[in-house]
Amino acid sequence: MSRASSQQASPTSQTFDPSDLSTYTLDVLHHYPLVDLLQQLNAIPNDLKIPDTYSKVEQAARINVLRAICVGFAEVRRHNDNRTLQRSTMFAVNDAASRIRPSIGLKRTFPTGIFSTTIHGSPSDDDISTS
């Protein structure tokens, strides 16, 4: 017997749409580079509403796929620790969740104005200028 001809489109013809849960399949996601997935996931609006057409089990399964992708990103980061800047203790290097916490792009940044600001007119400046 032959299979039914109503098969889904081939994975390469399907596109990943973060707002459409039906595109959260490994067949589709496998063909996207990590950078493209990150950019598309970061572009999801904060107030995105998922239609009620999906069952709770299906929604939970798709959320688990997304979590697996996130853990995969953390694993890629962990395997490349020797090729990037070392993580600082500020980001809890040795806690229980450090293995799955992504730290891509995290840096210690301080506004330069805090450390380079000089205050003119302080009492010490007045003492120097009058002597």
Swiss-Prot record:
It holds the Pfam family Herpes_UL35. InterPro entries: Herpes_UL35. It is found in: Virion; Host nucleus. GO terms for biological process: viral process. The keyword RNA-binding does not apply. Keywords: Capsid protein, Host nucleus, Virion. The keyword Ribonucleoprotein does not apply. One of its GO terms (cellular component) is host cell nucleus. Participates in the assembly of the infectious particles by decorating the outer surface of the capsid shell and thus forming a layer between the capsid and the tegument. Complexes composed of the major capsid protein and small capsomere-interacting protein/SCP assemble together in the host cytoplasm and are translocated to the nucleus, where they accumulate and participate in capsid assembly. Interacts with the major capsid protein/MCP. Belongs to the herpesviridae small capsomere-interacting protein family. This is Small capsomere-interacting protein. It comes from Gallid herpesvirus 2 (strain Chicken/Md5/ATCC VR-987) (GaHV-2).
